[in-house]
């Protein structure tokens, strides 16, 4: 994926609810360090039981499926987002998310 394009997509599609900064939770949990992290584990964020209990490790395949249709991939998630239909857009966002780390 194209991380630069993914950053713009992240800001327009996810930025209203998610921060890309470390430790900054908003409507949704901070997505800094999300790649390789287990679902439902950001300190200080009140997750749905569905996300806490899913124990998904966020990697290419899981992020791709979740971003395509969050409520299908994690039934009961409180993420009120229809999903991103274009695979290239999802892959570019994932490429950007991989850069959000120490």
Swiss-Prot record:
PROSITE patterns: CYTC. Binds 1 heme c group covalently per subunit. It comes from the Eukaryota. Residues 1-26 are annotated as: Disordered. Keywords: Acetylation, Electron transport, Heme, Iron, Metal-binding, Methylation, Mitochondrion, Respiratory chain, Transport. GO terms for molecular function: electron transfer activity; heme binding; metal ion binding. Its main location: mitochondrion. Residues 1-11 have a biased composition (Basic and acidic residues). The modification N-acetylglycine is found at residue 1. SUPFAM superfamilies: Cytochrome c (SSF46626). GO terms for cellular component: mitochondrial intermembrane space. Heme c binds at residues 17-18, 79. PANTHER family: CYTOCHROME C. Electron carrier protein. The oxidized form of the cytochrome c heme group can accept an electron from the heme group of the cytochrome c1 subunit of cytochrome reductase. Cytochrome c then transfers this electron to the cytochrome oxidase complex, the final protein carrier in the mitochondrial electron-transport chain. Belongs to the cytochrome c family. This is Cytochrome c.
